[in-house]
């Protein structure tokens, strides 16, 4: 038996909005420690990792490990029927083929039940090794979203470079080029407005902007975003989900064509 009750139902709606365009079908894994998802996008370029820890739920019952295959588009349609202030409860029986979403209004004068069929989804669980990153940038999430959106009007690849001077986002396209430089800034009134750059080694890596723009759909979840970069590893773009977990997006860097030509 599985029963999860989330008072901040809007969190779950925002989580779905931030992953449904990348991943069509995925398994939600429930264990005693939390509710999680790990899935590749359809073109196997990006990986999404979600964790909502059990202690963040008002009520969390998971008698045994359960994996529920869901179509995220359909799940999102159901969650859209919940009001932003609604309490959301997720229920499923062990071995059952459906999951029930229950939406309760804050005054508890309206309760809606939506039942959705589960799917059988084959998914390999990819071990994500803990790594030491050469550079880590923490910045306001809406600023990162704006940069990705602005650069997409010029080009389709962003080069993220971290040096002693700061972090530079640049692109080039048919109409010209664009460079946006952010310097470390911790003298701010609100901690979420700070730009913090931890650089162990300088890095410069290229990424597809359409994926970066997709990742920024998680902006409503968190005021800050953390970008971890290393020359040999995929970038990690992480958004915290309230105090209860995170969404992490992993994206492999693009190999520049001219480097391939040299090889």
UniProtKB/Swiss-Prot annotation:
Its main location: nucleus. It comes from the Eukaryota. The keyword DNA-binding applies. PROSITE patterns: PCNA_1 (PS01251), PCNA_2 (PS00293). GO terms for cellular component: nucleus. Keywords: DNA replication, DNA-binding, Nucleus. CDD domains: PCNA (cd00577). GO terms for molecular function: DNA binding; DNA polymerase processivity factor activity. Transmembrane segments: none annotated. It is found in: Nucleus. Residues 61-80 bind DNA. It holds the Pfam family PCNA_C. GO terms for biological process: DNA replication; regulation of DNA replication. InterPro entries: DNA_clamp_sf, Pr_cel_nuc_antig, Pr_cel_nuc_antig_C, Pr_cel_nuc_antig_CS, Pr_cel_nuc_antig_N. HAMAP family: DNApol_clamp_arch. Belongs to the PCNA family. This protein is an auxiliary protein of DNA polymerase delta and is involved in the control of eukaryotic DNA replication by increasing the polymerase's processibility during elongation of the leading strand. PANTHER family: PROLIFERATING CELL NUCLEAR ANTIGEN. This is Proliferating cell nuclear antigen. It comes from Brassica napus.
């Amino acid at each position: 038996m599985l029963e999860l009750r989330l008072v901040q139902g809007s969190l779950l709606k925002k989580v779905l909005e931030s992953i449904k365009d990348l991943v069509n079908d995925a398994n939600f894994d429930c264990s005693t420690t939390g509710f999680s998802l790990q899935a590749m996008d359809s073109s196997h370029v990006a990986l999404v990792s979600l964790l909502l820890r059990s202690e963040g739920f008002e009520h969390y019952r998971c008698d045994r490990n359960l994996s529920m295959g869901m179509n995220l588009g359909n799940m999102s349609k159901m969650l859209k029927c919940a009001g932003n202030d609604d309490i959301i409860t997720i229920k499923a029986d062990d071995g059952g083929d459906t999951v029930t979403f229950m939406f309760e209004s804050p005054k508890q004068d309206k309760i809606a039940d939506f039942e959705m069929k589960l799917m059988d989804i084959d998914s390999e669980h990819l071990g994500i090794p803990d790594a030491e990153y050469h550079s880590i940038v923490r910045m306001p999430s809406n600023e990162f979203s704006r940069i990705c959106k602005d650069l997409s009007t010029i080009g389709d690849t962003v080069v993220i470079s971290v040096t002693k001077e700061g972090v530079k986002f640049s692109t080039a396209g048919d109409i010209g080029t664009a460079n946006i430089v952010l310097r470390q800034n911790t003298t701010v009134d609100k901690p979420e407005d700070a730009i913090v750059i931890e650089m162990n080694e300088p890095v410069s890596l290229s990424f597809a902007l359409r994926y970066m723009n997709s990742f920024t759909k998680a902006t409503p979840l968190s005021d800050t975003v953390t970008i971890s970069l290393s020359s040999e590893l995929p970038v990690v773009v992480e958004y915290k989900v309230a105090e209860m977990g995170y969404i992490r997006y992993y994206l492999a860097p693009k190999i520049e064509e001219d480097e391939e030509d040299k090889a």
